[in-house]
């Protein structure tokens, strides 16, 4: 139901398909990706936690996009979307000291620098971004 578990599930199904040659879930992967890309992002690159509401925005919300685009071999097709989401994430979720915030929400946001949850996952996502787009 949420953005990052949806992306993670698509990644897992794709890995299964590629490693086994079993294409029986391929139409489900395509339908799931179509839902993911159409419903979890605003036009300006803002990620939505759930398909029907934005808040809270966890760092995994924008980060998962880059992993999923790479693993589903859709990076070229969705480059403009990826660039919008990366700009949004850096502008809104990166501290001026370089680390990434855990979560933005109305009222009180958690701008704590968690090594595993926020930074490691966003650095992983940025690695895929650099690998796919060379920036």
What are these regions (language model features)?
Residues 1-135:
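Glycan-recognition and catalytic cores of secretory/periplasmic carbohydrate-active enzymes
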């Amino acid at each position: 139901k949420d953005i990052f578990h949806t992306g993670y599930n698509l990644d897992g199904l794709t890995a299964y398909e590629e490693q086994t040659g079993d294409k029986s879930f391929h139409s489900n992967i395509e339908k799931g990706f179509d839902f993911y890309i159409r419903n979890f992002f605003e036009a300006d690159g803002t990620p939505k936690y759930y398909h029907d509401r934005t808040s809270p925005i966890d760092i995994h919300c924008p980060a998962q996009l880059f992993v999923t685009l790479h693993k589903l071999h859709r990076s070229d097709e969705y480059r403009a979307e990826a660039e919008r989401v990366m700009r949004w994430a850096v502008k809104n979720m990166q501290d001026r000291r370089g680390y990434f915030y855990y979560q933005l929400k109305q009222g009180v946001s958690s701008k704590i620098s968690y090594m595993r949850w926020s930074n490691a996952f966003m650095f992983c996502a940025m690695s895929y971004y650099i690998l796919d787009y060379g920036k």
